[in-house]
C-alpha cells in the first residue's frame, strides 16, 4: 500500500525546489498524492478495509491543509502544482 522508496525518491527529485529538498510544501503534497492514489487503488479491491479508509481520509485532510497553506503563501506555485498533479479540473 505504501509507495516504494524508489518511487518516493523519483517524486522528490521531480518536485524539489532545490538540491536536497525533501520537506517543501510541493514535495510533501506530491508524495501525499502518490500515497492517496495507492490507497485508492487498494480500496477499490478491498472495499471493507476501514482501517485503510481512515488512513486515506487523514492523508486527504493533510494534503488539503498543505494546499491551503501553499495557496495562501505562493499562488503561482500552487497553480503550477495542481496543474502538474492534475488535482483540479
UniProtKB/Swiss-Prot annotation:
Top-level taxon of the source organism: Bacteria
Name the record gives this protein: Small ribosomal subunit protein uS15
GO cellular component: cytosolic small ribosomal subunit
The family this protein is said to belong to: Belongs to the universal ribosomal protein uS15 family.
Gene designation per UniProt: rpsO
GO terms assigned for molecular function: rRNA binding; structural constituent of ribosome
Quaternary state and interactors: Part of the 30S ribosomal subunit. Forms a bridge to the 50S subunit in the 70S ribosome, contacting the 23S rRNA.
GO terms for biological process, alphabetical: translation
Task of the protein: One of the primary rRNA binding proteins, it binds directly to 16S rRNA where it helps nucleate assembly of the platform of the 30S subunit by binding and bridging several RNA helices of the 16S rRNA.
Protein's UniProt keywords contain Glycoprotein: no
